[in-house]
């Protein structure tokens, strides 16, 4: 893969994540206009802060990646390592947006 191919791949991943986020946000938040509604549920339930809720989800993904590295396969065959890595990238972007949103309140 050369640099241009990498940049095309990166752009395609980002475009895919925007579309996936739009769909999942609707699934998890319904018609609620708050993109962080689902993540803030950890605070509404007095479990932990929203930021730590993001971290828990990210740790789940890290653990899944670590398991894949150690075992070389996933038991759930319809989810690939690329899906898990993209999920992790998406959680990072969402947490970054949440922190920016909270700072600007």
Region annotations inferred by a language model:
Residues 1-105:
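Intrinsically disordered, low-complexity regulatory regions
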């Amino acid at each position: 893969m050369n640099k241009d191919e990498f940049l095309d791949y990166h752009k395609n991943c980002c475009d895919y994540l925007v579309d996936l986020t739009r769909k999942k946000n609707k699934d998890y938040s319904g018609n609620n206009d708050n993109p962080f509604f689902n993540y803030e549920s950890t605070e509404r339930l007095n479990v932990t802060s929203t930021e730590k809720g993001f971290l828990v989800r990210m740790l789940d993904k890290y653990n899944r990646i670590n398991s894949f590295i150690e075992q070389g396969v996933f038991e759930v065959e319809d989810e690939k390592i690329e899906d898990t890595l993209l999920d992790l990238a998406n959680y990072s972007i969402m947490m970054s947006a949440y922190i920016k949103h909270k700072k600007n309140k």
